[in-house]
């Protein structure tokens, strides 16, 4: 394995959600520990599942993994980090300032921006703590899905330059004082990330066009900010021995080989390793040990076929239920890589085919929609909330309004204020709230961003709800976006997941988060199911049998409505292929 050769002190795994970077980072940590290395495995993912993989509770302090000698682990929970960060800043001023001032400061520190800063603080501390490298030979970071990872890794440079040029702080950066004390740490973190002698970045992908395109963008963006020591790992490759088993296996194998032969520009030059698709889920040390075996192609498996597709669990039944309301907001939520874009497009096309007026829109920073929906329908409008464009529009609006009467020094300060990372969150939310107003007259189908971004989006929505409620007081009736999201008559939230242990668990966690915000998911879609795909391939049959318990968990514990969507022989791009999903 190329990525395992001469590993430096820091190793980062990144990639779209669901590609297996947690499994590979855990397997790498086990491999290094078995070679006698002292290893620290760190998760900075908001939906962390390292503890689930090792069947052990892992918190925000370093602790040994009981099943693997020489391996320790740490999970950084951004929400917990934000709470501790708030306490550090607010507690010292309680009793010194009036209560309303303290409450105002606390509220300013309750948004998504503070959560990012707090998580970044912990991330930076690990990268710049020299004592850790006396305790550990390698520190492995299991990072979040691609969009979040890029932002996380860009933060050192962004905050470092922002603090350097704006020593007086800025209105939207509540915890600036705390950041100022650690300015040298940020510079050292950037230095460590950019040093190929100390840091290696492993891009993890599956042999799917959209996943490879996203990894190529990640490669370009990280290279542009100085992280050039990159390797590529392609996970879940179907072995050639399965190709002759049946039509589905042959189609999957052919599709993967074509993708491998036509890697996007930039990726083909990277040192690359391929990992075979495994018959079992990657949970537990014994399963993980076999993952990095280059010669582990499956040679013999029992011939077992999953049972037929269950009744009333097709996507068409779900769409028929949605159509009865004749209009409304349909929001698809879930971890990145589970197929939200494709499911949103399939539902939108199906509703449009039924004669309804439909607006399909996305806030996904990766912008997959244009590639997924390659065609047009008369009564289907397709749009994208572009984070970059919306941020620029928001900046200009603020400069033209709030900045109109400022002197030159004030304008410069405001411009710097608008360069902070939280500005994009505000801008995207404002665009999002404009779109959902249309749902009173037609169907609005939203393909939302991956899990971490979705939670930040909902946090922004809640903050906006509180602000409107505060301003309106008792003056009359009003409806905020949050109120619309909470109303199942007007909004149907669909959770999209895969029939695998970790994606189901993460979707269940997302459901809990939504319910705490007063939002109750209307149904679940389990995508890419082999269990209902009628395959005769022994390996694919084994994978299908692994799905059944997870489908039962969703059905019995989490979802009031459920749809199963099979793995397709051809990638579902274009209107005709999307129609085949709704059967």
Curated annotation (Swiss-Prot):
A Pfam family it matches: ArsA_ATPase
Known EC number: 7.3.2.7
Reaction equations catalysed: arsenite(in) + ATP + H2O = arsenite(out) + ADP + phosphate + H(+)
Alphabetical list of Gene3D superfamilies matching this protein: P-loop containing nucleotide triphosphate hydrolases (3.40.50.300)
Record: residues binding ATP: 15-22, 334-341
UniProt-listed InterPro entries: Anion-transp_ATPase-like_dom (IPR025723), Ars_ATPase (IPR027541), ATPase_ArsA/GET3 (IPR016300), P-loop_NTPase (IPR027417)
First-tier enzyme category under EC: translocase
The keyword Heme belongs to this UniProt entry's keyword annotation: no
Keyword entries, A-Z: Arsenical resistance, ATP-binding, Nucleotide-binding, Plasmid, Translocase
GO MF entry, a single one: ATP binding
Positions of transmembrane segments: none
The keyword tRNA-binding is assigned to this record: no
Described purpose of this protein according to its UniProt entry: Anion-transporting ATPase. Catalyzes the extrusion of the oxyanions arsenite, antimonite and arsenate. Maintenance of a low intracellular concentration of oxyanion produces resistance to the toxic agents.
Family stated for the protein in its record: Belongs to the arsA ATPase family.
Name of this chain's protein: Arsenical pump-driving ATPase
Gene symbol of the encoding locus: arsA
